[in-house]
A protein has these predicted regions:
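Surface/interface-facing alpha-helical segments and adjacent flexible terminal/loop regions used
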Residues: 1-145
Length: 145
């Protein structure tokens, strides 16, 4: 039982890490929380290669400002002069941003106690950032059972 709790807590941390790279926040405190999370995971890696990967990520991130990460995020996902990388399951499934996969996610979420905070989170329910966040929450809930 304890092993499952530990594994689910670790999963939650990694899902949060991934979510933070796909959910744009201009708030500096969120960026510094991401840096802190990477440091925690680096100090407690799943294995040697994960520790090295986390160290490489830390080296690339500016420890004092989120400006570079925000620019890279915009270039990848929003810049109209480049080929944007789409972030929704619906797009990859049907070629549209809001389709069957979004409906499936809404129906799935309706069966849980979790909800999307529509005041602070504007991406669709089938966006990769939201899915990672949801997986983190579900992993935390499993760990707490």
């Amino acid at each position: 039982m304890q092993d499952n709790q530990t594994i689910n807590k670790a999963r939650a941390l990694y899902y949060n890490l991934f979510a933070n790279f796909f959910i744009l926040s201009s708030k500096s405190e969120n960026y510094f929380e991401l840096i802190r999370l990477i440091k925690i995971l680096k100090e407690n890696p799943l294995d040697e290669s994960s520790g090295e990967a986390l160290e490489n990520i830390l080296v690339l991130l500016d420890p004092s400002s989120n400006v570079v990460l925000i620019k890279e995020f915009d270039d990848l996902f929003h810049n109209p002069t480049t080929k944007k990388i789409r972030q929704t399951a619906s797009f990859y499934n049907e070629g549209v941003e809001s389709g069957k996969k979004r409906v499936e996610m809404i129906e799935f979420i309706a069966k849980t106690k979790l909800r999307r905070d529509e005041n602070s989170y504007f991406e669709y329910e089938d966006s990769i950032g939201f899915i990672f966040s949801l997986m983190a929450e579900l992993s935390d809930l499993l760990a707490d059972d």
